[in-house]
Regions:
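C-terminal catalytic "cap/lid" subdomain
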Residues: 2-306
Length: 306
């Protein structure tokens, strides 16, 4: 029995040693992590938050962006509103906008902040209206259909976010933006995460979801996806629904951010596996294929294994 205990302790020590070069590489770097509402419904939240708190303690600067789609939809239905989406974007009338604010800034955000505090971290909840940190313009009609109070990010004010990070805090960001007309706008959380990653010059953008990653026509997981292939899969109806803004957001970021990934939050400690080990759990997004074996820009490891 004592031998088994010692073997387990050695195994844990080896895991820490394996993580050391990755911790050294990312220490002081900013990461933007988006946790989707569907992933939160699956019960993986504490595992994700434990990972985020650990990253903060080892000198990495995580920014958490959260969704809340399933809960917003549930509240819409309580008020007799049928949720409607166009290319993964929620059609948002005035009443739905109020419900979104209530859910994101009044419930989901504070709950995540409380959980982080219980895990030993320090977090502050905010939305794009605060500061304001996100100035947005109304998003153009999609396929001839108006989206209502749906915003497109025009400016990011990084100063309050940098201040929180410099204080050792974890910003927990709700995807609400402020329009130039003074109105609040619902902004897709994947889009918010990408724009924050670009503005903050993050080393990585990680989009956590409740599926393995992006799949091809055969249903096989794509460990790497470039812009050309993504465009083909979207136009061909292979990438659909809520995966469209995820892929679009990730590809928007990769020209500036070190790397962008869509990973499976259902895998325990998926963030640590992605960042601090050689194991991969999703799809890496790249600008274009180089014709060589894809390499993780920040960690220096083969795509699909980092």
């Amino acid at each position: 029995m004592a031998g088994e205990v010692m073997s387990e302790r050695i195994r844990r020590a080896e895991i820490l040693v394996e993580a050391l070069p990755y911790i050294r590489r990312f220490s002081g770097h900013t990461l933007v992590i988006k946790l989707g509402g569907a992933a939160m419904d699956g019960g993986e939240v504490d595992s994700v938050l434990q990972d985020i708190v650990l990253l903060r303690f080892v000198g990495i600067r995580p920014v958490l962006v959260h969704g809340g789609g399933p809960e917003i939809s549930a509240w819409q239905e309580r008020f007799g509103i049928t949720p409607k989406f166009i290319d993964g974007l929620r059609v948002t009338d005035a009443q739905t906008m109020e419900l979104a604010k209530m859910v994101l800034t009044g419930k989901v955000g504070p709950d995540l902040v409380s959980r982080i505090h219980r895990l030993g971290g320090t977090a502050i909840g905010l939305s794009g209206e605060d500061g304001p940190t996100l100035l947005v313009r109304p998003r153009a009609a999609q396929g001839g259909q108006e989206l209502g109070f749906v915003g497109e990010v025009d400016q990011v004010n990084c100063e309050p976010i940098h201040a929180m990070l410099d204080q050792g805090r974890i910003p927990v960001f709700a995807s609400i933006g402020l329009g130039y007309d003074g109105e609040a706008y619902n902004v897709n959380a994947d889009t918010v995460a990408a724009e924050l990653a670009v503005a903050l010059r993050a080393s990585k953008l990680i989009l956590l979801t409740d599926v393995e990653g992006v799949k091809d026509e055969r249903g096989d997981l794509l460990t790497e996806l470039d812009k050309e292939e993504a465009t083909r899969l979207i136009s061909g109806g292979v990438i659909t629904g809520g995966m469209i803004p995820k892929v679009t957001a990730g590809l928007r970021a990769v020209d500036t951010v070190g790397a962008a990934h869509i990973i499976d939050a259902r895998v325990a400690h998926a963030l640590l596996l992605e960042l601090l080990t050689e194991s991969g759990v999703g799809t890496m997004l790249v600008s274009s294929r180089s014709g060589e074996e894809p390499v993780n820009a920040a960690a220096g490891t083969v795509a699909g294994t980092a």
